[in-house]
Amino acid sequence: MPRNRTLWLVSIMALVTTAFASGPALAQDPEELEIGFVPSIEAGALAEDIQPLADYLSDALGMPVRGKVTSSYPALVTALQIGQTHIGALPPLGMVQAVDVAGAEVILQSVRFGSPTYHTQFFTNAPDRYCASAPVVNERREAGEMLPFLNCNGTDRPFDGVPVGPIGLEALQKIERGTTVAFTRAGSSSGYIFPATVLANQGIDPVTDLNVIFAGEHDYSVIAVCTGEAEVGVSYDDARPDTVTDCDVAETVVVFAYGPEIPNDGIAVSGDLSDGLRDRIKQALLDYAATPEGAAVLDTIYNINAFADPDLGSLQIIRDAVEQLGYGQ
């Protein structure tokens, strides 16, 4: 059954804000650094994937850099605020919290397929309901291999194409009251905040009209739809090639809509670091992304193709979406 709205919002805001207590300021730059990540897929794999980046930064900066996988984005923002973590890879909402609450500085934003933005994808195991015509095969590259997946309602594209949302949102009106929908986390931009506002704009209350599952990671949302636990799911575009399961994702999970464009994730550093160290961290990351080895590691970690200077003005759309959902009211 849908949860009570007040309890829903209180629990979300408790997760997002309660840990942001003030910590002691650092008098000088630390002797070693910690770079933090939060898994969008299986956490154990991420811990292994980030080690080459940490090793590179250690050499480039001339000081030990350790990688850490944290349990949630609020926890990572808190770690940045109190100086426990010094560099954080954050999603859009995490960057807003890092700037507005933790006093951190965003130094870079990710670029994928030449684009500084991305979007939510809506997918289903019931294409007869949500697809206006038969799904078509799209190929996606994963670990150098081309894999076929199904899309409909104009969401299909070449494997290296860069679609711009929104596309196919009229199909969301076919979601009936009581339908089970798999989101990822309550604080995820593409996994909850933006799809929830899109649904609300289509006349569907994501709290009272739906049976909601919070799957946790984006690949788990795909699995929930593939196994029939949910009829509709959401994730970043495209989480299907990153999903490891015995279920036949390629034949079962059909993408039928894209949400509006969202600014990409980025890198934030603790506000306690000196300007000189911040600049060195930024340059080291730019240099790493420009090497074949670094490009491969960043692609494995978060499908990052490059870094660019941050557009902090683009984050206002995140603040607006959070306000529309009533977080903190």
What are the language-model segments listed below?
Residues 92-103, 198-201, 224-251:
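A ligand-binding cleft/hinge motif common to bilobed small-molecule-binding domains
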Residues 58-69, 84, 146-160, 177-180, ...:
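A local structural motif
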Residues 30-50:
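Extracytoplasmic "Venus flytrap"
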Residues 110-191, 202:
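A conserved helix-loop-strand patch within extracytoplasmic ligand-binding domains
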Residues 67-78, 91, 205-223, 261-263:
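Short helix-initiation/N-cap motifs at beta->coil->alpha
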